[in-house]
Amino acid sequence: MSSGLIGKKVGMTSVFDDEGNNVACTVVEAGPNVVTQVKSEGRDGYSAVQLGFDNVKEKNVTQAMLGHFEKAGCPPKRMLSEFRDFGDDVDLGDVVRVQDLFQEDERIDVVGVSKGKGFQGVVKRHGFSGVGMMTHGQSDRQRHPGSIGASADPSRVFKGVRMAGQTGGERTKIQNLRVVRILADQNAILIHGSVPGPKSEYVELHKK
């Protein structure tokens, strides 16, 4: 069986646990996924299983990809992703459902693309404190980065100095999130806390 699933973030909600605590959860539409390709060590150089999720119209898919999906016997999929760790019982065209892979109270990793926040300064982007308090004399540089390097020596700015720039929109992994509930009839999984990305963002759910 595959070591993960492709899902789509639906939104957030809250549920009550057995002790009456209100638990904030993210609802993810997890599958069903279809095995669109099985890679082997001998043929491809590494072992992996490729899963497809979310149907797409044939007119929006290239001829090469249409042939790829025909081999698996499934309609074209919008999202494809590979998972490396899996068992030997996976065949081309198999359907993988959320209840086949995950259990409640299990810990999983979630990978997605974080929300893009545009061009941001160092305070928001890196958590800088600014250059000092106004009571110490400065009056117009509260959110500035301060010095970015020395002067004559080395006469340049070192690589990796944290500055303002494009924030968010990066592939991000959140680890050790707890599975609160599995709704098999709705192909949904409730995950404790938040996961990367906006609503309708595709995410990968990885087993630990």
Swiss-Prot record:
Look up and give the organism this protein is from: Salinibacter ruber (strain DSM 13855 / M31)
As for what it does, the entry says: One of the primary rRNA binding proteins, it binds directly near the 3'-end of the 23S rRNA, where it nucleates assembly of the 50S subunit.
Q: Does the keyword RNA-binding apply?
A: yes
InterPro entries for the chain: Ribosomal_uL3, Ribosomal_uL3_bac/org-type, Ribosomal_uL3_CS, Transl_B-barrel_sf
- Hey, which family's this protein in? Belongs to the universal ribosomal protein uL3 family.
Keyword RNA-binding present in the record's keywords: the answer is: yes
The UniProt entry, under PANTHER family, shows: 50S RIBOSOMAL PROTEIN L3, LARGE RIBOSOMAL SUBUNIT PROTEIN UL3C
Official protein name in the record: Large ribosomal subunit protein uL3
Q: Which UniProt keywords apply?
A: Ribonucleoprotein, Ribosomal protein, RNA-binding, rRNA-binding
**Gene Ontology molecular functions:** rRNA binding; structural constituent of ribosome
Q: Name one GO biological process term.
A: translation
A GO cellular component annotated for this chain's UniProt record is: cytosolic large ribosomal subunit
What is known about its subunit structure? Part of the 50S ribosomal subunit. Forms a cluster with proteins L14 and L19.
User: Record's Pfam families?
Assistant: Ribosomal_L3 (PF00297)
